[in-house]
Amino acid sequence: MSRRLFTSESVTEGHPDKIADQISDTILDALLREDPTSRVAVETLITTGLVHVAGEVTTKAYADIANLVRGKILEIGYDSSKKGFDGASCGVSVSIGAQSPDIAQGVDTAYENRVEGDEDELDRQGAGDQGLMFGYASDETPTLMPLPVFLAHRLSKRLSEVRKNGTIPYLRPDGKTQVTIEYDGDKAVRLDTVVVSSQHASDIDLESLLAPDIKEFVVEPELKALLEDGIKIDTENYRLLVNPTGRFEIGGPMGDAGLTGRKIIIDTYGGMARHGGGAFSGKDPSKVDRSAAYAMRWVAKNVVAAGLAARCEVQVAYAIGKAEPVGLFVETFGTAKVDTEKIEKAIDEVFDLRPAAIIRALDLLRPIYAQTAAYGHFGRELPDFTWERTDRVDALREAAGL
C-alpha cells in the first residue's frame, strides 16, 4: 500500500469568515422562526468596526437585523476593543431587497407543473438555482466523517471551549486548527502534524505558557477522546506547531475582513471529497446549494452505514426551476460491496431528491441554521441535524439485494 499525508483544517467561531456565516444564519433563523416560507439569501461582510449585511429576502416576518448582528458578535466573545472588535459599539449597515420575481416563478411553480402539467404536490417546487452538490461519508470515524476534518473540528471547538470556560483565560476568539494524517492506502495510521493558531492577549509568552497550555488543555484531551471513540492511530510522535508566526495578538475582523461563504471546505469534508462550489450560510432550504448538499450527506452516510461501501461520494445536479434532478452520480473508490450501479439504483428508489421532498424529509423549514455555521455542517449528530440520521439503512440494503 502507498503511504500519503492528507491535511484538513478548521477555524473557531471567532474567525472573521465564521462570524459572517453565523450572522447570516442567525438572520435566516429569525425569519424562519416567524415565517417558515421565507426566501432568504443574506450575505455578511465584517471588517474593523463595521458589519454590512446585504442580500435578497421575501418574507412576512420582521427581524431587527442590527440587534441580531450585535447579539451574535457578543455571544462569540468580541465585547471589547481590546479584543479587536466590540459588538456593542460596531456599525451595522443593511442593504436587503426582495427576491427576483424571475427566480421566484421557477421555485414556486416548477417546470414539471408549469410546462408538463404535473399535479404532484412535490413537483410544484423547482430548484432555486442550477448547480451540482456532493455528499460524502467514510467508515474511518464513528460519525462516518474523514478523520482529518473530524479531528480539526474537535480541536477548534475545544479551543473555543477553554477560552469561554476560563481554562485558558488569555485566549481571544479568533483561531485555527490544522491536522495532517498519514494514510496507508485508505486506512488512517498515524497523526503526523497538528497546527493550532490562537489569538491571545498581549504579553503572553509562546514557549513557556501558550504552547504548553494548548498541548495540555486542547490537543491531548482530544487525542485521548480519539481512543475512547475507537479510533486507533499512532499519536505518539506527532509534531505540534502552536502559533508558528510567534505572535497572534491582532485577530478577528481587525486582522482580516470576513465574508459569508468563504470556508466551504471547512464546512464540508475538509477537502477529502469534491465540492460543487455553493456555500450554505444565509440561504433558506429552497436553495439547493444548501438543502441538496445536506441531502447528499444523508444519502452517502446511509450508504456507508448500510455496509454497501466503506467510502461513498454522491453527486446530484439540478436545473433552476425544475424539481427532478438532472443527474445523479455515485463514486465508491473501489470499496463497494455490491455493484455501484446497484447502489445508484437503490438510492434512486429509496430517496426522493426533489427539493420539496428533501425539505419535507429532513424538516428543513425550521430555525436550526445558526448552530450549523461553525465547526462543520456534517458529522455532528445533534438532534436538529436530521441529515445525519441513518434511517434509510434497511431500505437501501433491501433495494440493493442484501
UniProtKB/Swiss-Prot annotation:
Pathway: Amino-acid biosynthesis; S-adenosyl-L-methionine biosynthesis; S-adenosyl-L-methionine from L-methionine: step 1/1
Keyword annotations of the record: ATP-binding, Cytoplasm, Magnesium, Metal-binding, Nucleotide-binding, One-carbon metabolism, Potassium, Transferase
InterPro entries assigned: ADOMET_SYNTHASE_CS, S-AdoMet_synt_C, S-AdoMet_synt_central, S-AdoMet_synt_N, S-AdoMet_synthetase, S-AdoMet_synthetase_sfam
GO cellular component: cytosol
GO molecular-function term, one example from the UniProt record: methionine adenosyltransferase activity
Signal peptide annotation: none
Manner of cofactor binding, per the entry note: Binds 2 divalent ions per subunit.
Main location, first listed in the record: cytoplasm
TM helices/strands, residue ranges: none
Residues reported to bind K(+): 43
EC main group: transferase
CDD domains referenced in this protein's UniProt entry, alphabetically: S-AdoMet_synt (cd18079)
Subcellular location: Cytoplasm
Catalytic reaction equation(s): L-methionine + ATP + H2O = S-adenosyl-L-methionine + phosphate + diphosphate
Protein family: Belongs to the AdoMet synthase family.
NCBIfam families, per the entry: metK
Function (record text): Catalyzes the formation of S-adenosylmethionine (AdoMet) from methionine and ATP. The overall synthetic reaction is composed of two sequential steps, AdoMet formation and the subsequent tripolyphosphate hydrolysis which occurs prior to release of AdoMet from the enzyme.
Assembly notes: Homotetramer; dimer of dimers.
Name recorded for this polypeptide: S-adenosylmethionine synthase
Recorded name of the encoding gene: metK
